[in-house]
């Protein structure tokens, strides 16, 4: 009986230690609503241990890739950046996860009443991949973060992966509030032009009302979540903005990238940026999705080290 009691006490002691440690490393967070062109986006802000609003803190905005969701960022990526001393903001693009939908009026627009209001039937737009709207959402997230107490607006970084790896280049090139960039396995708009005529045909069909103004359920790419708005993708080329980047930028690729030509995208962007800013290009072996599994730890550590070096 004494041995049992002793084991029970030891077990209780170790459980208590684990609880204390888990609380010590628990992330302080709050849910936030971010407004982007009149539509609410759902987001989360995470704060480092010992956060003090009276002391300006460096911050990072994380943008997930094609069909991604912030909950995955929150679970796997965010803790590493927060433990390194950063405030982190994540969000879901409009029309994804628990962010509100963009709305399109069904039928003819009713007459406007004396208060300037109308009652309409509308279609909720969900899970459409629109690079123009998504980059607008990142700008809105940046606006929101700059109004958050305790954020040093001179030390804000952008982290983007896959399709959003191009978005962060596009945004940073146009917004001088961005102080550092990390972009991994990124498509920079420098792809093959064999489908350009089809993209243009989709734009014609939208303008003439042949297809929905924001098409859903068409042109879906196998194994990828969401409907691409091909008309919006036609002229979207972050690489064309790379020459305006003047802040430290780390580009990470995989050597056997199978979704696009990395040399025409990530490497080409690096070769442009290096002329005007501190920059680095790094590759891992493997294919696109290996960055999230086999090379998750190594790539994320590179990102943390980059932001520590240039934001802290």
Regions found by a protein language model. Give the residues of each.
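Short beta-strand element of the alpha/beta-hydrolase
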Residues: 55-65
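The serine-hydrolase catalytic nucleophile loop
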Residues: 67-79, 93, 264
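Serine-hydrolase catalytic core
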Residues: 218-286, 299
């Amino acid at each position: 009986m004494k041995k049992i009691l002793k084991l029970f006490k030891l077990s209780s002691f170790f459980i208590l230690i684990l609880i204390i440690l888990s609380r010590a490393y628990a992330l302080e967070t709050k849910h936030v609503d971010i407004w982007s062109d009149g539509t609410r986006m759902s987001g989360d802000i995470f704060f480092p241990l010992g956060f003090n609003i009276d002391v300006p803190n460096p911050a990072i905005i994380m943008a997930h890739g094609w069909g991604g969701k912030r909950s995955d960022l929150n679970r796997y990526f965010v803790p590493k950046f927060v433990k390194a001393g950063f405030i982190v903001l994540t969000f879901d693009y409009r029309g994804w996860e628990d962010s509100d939908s963009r709305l399109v009026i069904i039928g003819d627009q009713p007459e406007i009443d004396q208060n300037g209001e109308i009652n309409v039937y509308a279609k909720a737009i969900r899970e459409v991949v629109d690079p123009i709207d998504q980059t607008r959402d990142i700008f809105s997230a940046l606006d929101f973060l700059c109004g958050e107490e305790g954020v040093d607006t001179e030390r804000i970084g952008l982290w983007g992966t896959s399709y959003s790896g191009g978005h962060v280049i596009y945004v940073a090139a146009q917004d001088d509030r961005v102080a550092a960039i990390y972009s991994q396995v990124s498509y920079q708009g420098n792809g093959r032009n064999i489908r350009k005529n089809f993209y243009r045909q989709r734009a014609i069909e939208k303008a003439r009302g042949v297809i929905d103004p924001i098409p859903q359920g068409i042109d879906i790419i196998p194994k990828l979540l969401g409907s691409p708005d091909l008309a919006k993708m036609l002229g979207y080329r972050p690489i064309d903005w790379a020459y305006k980047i003047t802040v430290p930028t780390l580009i990470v690729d995989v050597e056997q990238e199978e979704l696009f030509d990395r040399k025409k995208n990530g490497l080409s962007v690096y070769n442009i940026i290096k002329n005007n800013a501190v920059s680095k290009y790094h590759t891992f072996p493997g294919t696109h999705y290996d960055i999230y599994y086999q090379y998750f730890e190594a790539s994320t550590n590179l990102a943390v080290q980059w932001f520590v070096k240039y934001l802290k």
